[in-house]
Design a protein with these regions (language model features):
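Catalytic cores of extracellular degradative/oxidative enzymes
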Residues: 1-107
Length: 107
């Protein structure tokens, strides 16, 4: 929501709005689901179906792109994005029994 608005207007308010949306995605998951401080968006847990996890990661990346280097939230956002990339790479790319990289279906 705030990403494109910030790009068009330059108002700092929209950076904070994007950061709020990214952190709200963390808070909608339990500690165990998001792997505590790693902030992983699991695609097969609760409301995070594949599409929901992808939207959460997109919002996280947008917040990271807008957050200035001297902002204290930047390190947390960067850690979470790196954890998500590592999680999904390990789960779908490195797994020898999943050569096509198919996404796990949800119930």
């Amino acid at each position: 929501m705030g990403f494109m608005a910030y790009l068009l207007s330059g108002f700092h308010y929209f950076i904070e709005e994007t950061q709020l949306l990214a952190t709200a995605n963390f808070l909608k998951n339990s500690d165990e689901t998001r792997r505590f401080s790693k902030g992983v968006f699991e695609s097969s847990a609760g409301a995070n179906i594949t599409r929901g996890a992808a939207w959460s990661i997109r919002t996280l990346a947008q917040a990271l792109a807008l957050t200035p280097d001297d902002d204290s939230l930047r390190a947390e956002l960067l850690n979470s994005l790196q954890s998500n990339v590592a999680h999904y790479h390990r789960r779908y790319v490195e797994t020898p029994n999943n050569p096509l990289g198919l996404i796990q279906p949800y119930d």
